[in-house]
Amino acid sequence: SNSSGLHRVLQDTTLALLRQPDLWVYANVESGNVPFNAAESTFNRLSMTERSKLREELTTNVGGVRSSGGDLTSRGDADATSEFIVVTVLVASRRVVNLKQAENGEQLRESLRILGSTASSDLMALEVIWQPDGVGDVLSADELVTAYPNLRHL
């Protein structure tokens, strides 16, 4: 929960994504600036918007405390033709982070590099959300485009 811990999670997440470009199918990159006094409420609103897309949250890690919930027995069967995972990375930084929309894999790679190089002293908040979370859980193509209409095919 401290800035060095958040920095480590951000770097680990962006590196994991950068190491799997063959798995990138869709992407969306957004960035914006808000006044400092609105930063927390804006971050919380974005977090709630993204988390509300989940059927349920199975694993959370807040302040280093991990908790699990949900019923792992009700998962669907994985199907290689329709199995997707969505990773959402929300970052609140003291400095402006200029990211461009990802029209292709190289632009996504550059945005991930920029995001991953955010200095720990600039990192105010971080949330990494992935869906699906459970073993064997499936996110179909229809569910993907319904929940994430801003995604662009790479």
Regions flagged by a language model, labelled:
Residues S1-V145:
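Structured extramembrane domains adjacent to transmembrane segments
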Residues V145-L154:
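A cross-kingdom marker for long, charged
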